[in-house]
Structures are given as C-alpha cells and as structure tokens.
Amino acid sequence: MREPLVFLSAVLGLGIAAQWLAWRLRLPSILLLLAFGFLVGWLCGDDPSLAGKTITDEILTTDLLFPIVALAVSVIMFEGGLTLRFRDLEDSGSVLLRLVTLGALVTWGLAGLAAYLFVGVDYRTATLIGAILIVTGPTVITPLLRHVRPHRRIGSVIKWEGIVIDPIGAVLAVLVFDAMVVGKSDEVVWVLLKILLVGIGLGLGVAFALVQLMRRYWIPDFLHNSVFLAAAVGAFALSNQIAHEAGLVTVTILGIALANQKTIPVNHVVEFKENLRVLLISCLFIVLAARIQFTDIVELGWGGLAFVAALILVVRPLAALVSTWRSELTWNERCFLAFLAPRGIVAAAVSSVFALEISSHYGDLAELKNADQIVSLTFLVIVGTVTFYGLAAAPLARFLGLAVKNHQGVLFAGGSPWVLPLAKAIYEEDIPVLVVDTNFRHVSEARMLGLPSSCASVVSDYMEETDLGGIGRLLAVTPNDDLNTLAAMEYAPLFGRGEVYQLPFREIVAGRRETSAHNRGRYLFGQDATHSKLSFRVAMGAQVKKTKITKEFTYEDFLKLYGDTTVLMGVLADNKQLSLATANTELQPKPGQTVIALVDPRDGEAN
C-alpha cells in the first residue's frame, strides 16, 4: 500500500465501513475505528528501506499530517460548538462550570502524579501529560452519546464538558510547556491573556460578521455551508498564528455564539457539519492509530496499564465527585459522569505536537529524556479509555436507569381518538411513548389513559428541550397531511429515515399533488389508511386489539375471525421488539408474536 491514492482511498473506505458495522452491530464506532486503524498500521508496517519508519509515515509526513489533523479538529470543534445551547444547562450549569475548572485541576494534578509514579517519567513531562489528558473531546464523546443516548440532563452536561474542556486542556498544555519546558514561567500570565483575548475576541467577531452577512442575505443559500466552513478554518488558522493554540478557543466560541444567537437559522449548517464530522472522525482515528507501533506501547509495560487504570478508576471518579458535590445531579447521574471520560483526537494531536517540539528543540535536555513517551502513553490512554468506556458506558447507563437498551419508543404526533388506543397498546408492553398534540382535549384524554403527553406542536422549539429518552421513532398521525410531512422531515435526522412514519395522503395521486418520497416518512399501515378513514372506522365501533398468535390460533385464523377490513398496525415479537406495518412492508406474524390491529367488532361485541 505504497501509493498515496490507494492508502487514502482505503482509509476513507475503512472509516465508513467501520461506522456502518458499528451501526449494524450496535457497537461504539470508536472501537471499530481503532481496530481498523491498527489493521492499517499492521498492513503498512515497517519497511527496511525506510530506516525504521512505517509506510504510513512515508505517505503522510509529519509536516503534512499535523496541519491536516489540526484543521480537521477545528472543524469538529466548530461543529460541536454549534450543537451547544445554553438552555440545555438551565438546571446544571454550575456542574459544568465546576467540571471544567475544579474538575480539570483535579484531573491535571492526579494524572500527572500517576504518570510520575507508574510510568516513571520526570516531573516536567508528567505535568505536561497531566495537562494534555484533561481533554475528552467530541470526537469520542459524541459517538458514545449517540450510542448510549442517556437522559437529557446528564447527556447535556457530558456533551458540554467534552467540547468546552478541549480548548481549556490545550491552553493549559501550552502554559505548562512554556513554563516548565521552555522556561518562560514569567510570561505565563501574558500568554494566557493573549490566548483568551485572541480566542474569544476573534470567535465573537467572526460570529458577528457571519450573522450580519446572513441577515442581509449577502450570502446565497448554496454558499452557506462553504462560507461557514471557510470562516471557521480561517479563524482557527489566524488565531493560531497570533497566539499558539488559541485556535481551538476561537472555533469553540464561534460555534457557541452562532448556536445561541436568535437572528439567523443555523440548523442547515449544523446538519452539514454533522455529516462532515462523521467523515473526519473516521479518517482521523484510522490514520493516527495506523501510525502507532505496538512496540512503543508495549515498552510502557505494566506501568502504562496501571496509569490507564488509575485514570479510569481513581482520577476521573474523584474529579467528578469533587465537581458534583452538593449539586442537583442525582447519585446515579454522578456515577455515570464518574465513569465516562474517554480521550480522543485532540489529546492525540496535542501530545504529538509537543513531543515533536521537544524532540526538535529540547531533546538535549536531560530532564526531558522521557518526553518521547508522551505520544505512546497518550495513545495507550486513548485505546484503554475508549475500549473501557465504549464497552461499559451503555450497560452502566441502563443499570443506573439513565438509558434503555433498545430505543424503539414511539413519539406520536397527534392524539386523535383512534391514535390513543394504539399508543396505550404499545405503552402497556413497556415501550416508551409520548403523545404530542396542540389540541388540549386530546392531551387530556391521553393523560386520563395514563399516557405521557404534552400539549405542544411537534415541530416547535419546545420539542428540542423535551427529553426523548427511549424514543426512537416518529408516528406523524395528525389530520393535517402537510404537518405530518413536515414532522417527518424534522425528525428524520434524529431518528433516521427508516424510523419516521406518517399516514398516507388523503388522495394518493401521482404527479404534482403528491409529496416527493424523499420529503416524507414511510406510509403507515397501507396506501388507503388515511386519517379520515381510520377516524370513521373508530367512530363506527372499530377497536384497536392486541391478539397473541399461537400454533393453534394462526394469523390466518385471526383474519378469518375479524374479516378483510382488518388494518394491521404492528407486530410485537417475543423480545418486545415492535415492528410497524407500512404500505411497502408486509408483516407475517408468527406463533408467539402479538398482533396489534384495528378490527371491526364481531356480532355480540360491544361497540
């Protein structure tokens, strides 16, 4: 794999393959990305003709790789900032503040001490390692949160911490490097002020400029994503030129400022950046993991493993405990927070930059004889923490009652009389449901049936603040076909296109009167199962029934009993897995499964 084109194509293909396999196997994508990265590194192993270097090093030289990594990280941090809303922290803002200040100090001190005791590095290198390992980062936190999907409050705290702590850790590492390695301790305060002034000032300034350009419609729609991306990358590069490592502060502030202003919409930009983030994370993890040689990690020995264990079992729990002391978080939330702090790309990038700087300019200092271990130790921490948290986060969240194993709950957009019996039938099977309707009478009836409900529009800003823990699909079942279509479009990025459903239009007509397939959800139940027809059936006495299918009473027997007018709505498997009937999917209920259907009353049954 000596050809750069072949190598880069393989990295891209393996990255997307890892993401897809992780989705299919319901595993954290980071685990597979690391595995594929090590596989690439093994395939591109040492070549005698390269004087100890790997083929990966030959294709992506240090001078080329680190700027690419830095720019990719800047885009990821910018996208992360765009997802941060101040309203998410209305009841937990103090916890975040303590996590990124007091918690960061505890992590810095204890991680540095652990590196000194277990790995045997000198105190300067240990202090620098402690500063680098403060960061967690959206490159690992975001995929894990998407995999676990914990309750909204603790999820928001973890997401905010993962993004805000990155520039803090990078800045602290710069200060430590200048003070303890370069020997410019008298300039630390000035360096810090310079980074903050440049980072915050430039971030807010670029955000203001973008808002003004967008507000005046000086940027055409087709250039929105490109302009935002160029602005973020340009601001990052300019900040770093003025003050070293101020770029991460700039892009984070830029993203947060744009996300919380009320003048222009940025949702379409966020969607583009999310797609770009998946691509960048996939490629970065594989490329950086491919550069690591197992011999470097093995040389750390048991001391390296003890260091990783100390970070997971001692350092993070103590930092979380101190930061959440007497806070509004429950003990279960604190416990989950204490066992989720994986390190990612930012830690790898920062450690690589400082190791290169030390080896290039300060390698003759005896006090820094262990500096070459910074990168290998950081990657050991990345592998160890990602593996541990990747495997343990989801089971722990479910054990603590902060997440569910299978996000197959249903969000009902609409609470008409025929909808509520269906919602109740699903809710009785311990599957989460939420009924949302602007008609208070429908909401009141849902509450009388014991169903979680909310009087709101399903496409309102209010829904962005609603905890959708356990919810994994949308049923848009209002009388308004256009609203159903809008809801399907709104929730497709959240649940996936395969999990957004809506009722068929009142008249299915090919051509200009039908909404395009890519702009709507999957049609529920059947092509003629419109809202008016279902409502009429219920008004005439039809009922939603659950019936167990057995070998003695097959689905064919069920259809014979209730007739051809039966509308199959869904099937519950033995493991409580719910499959919904659609116009293009023919369900075949088997013995042991439960049928949910709208049936007409038989003779002698009450309406």
Regions flagged by a language model, labelled:
Residues 329-330, 354-376, 380-607:
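Cytosolic regulatory regions of ion transport systems
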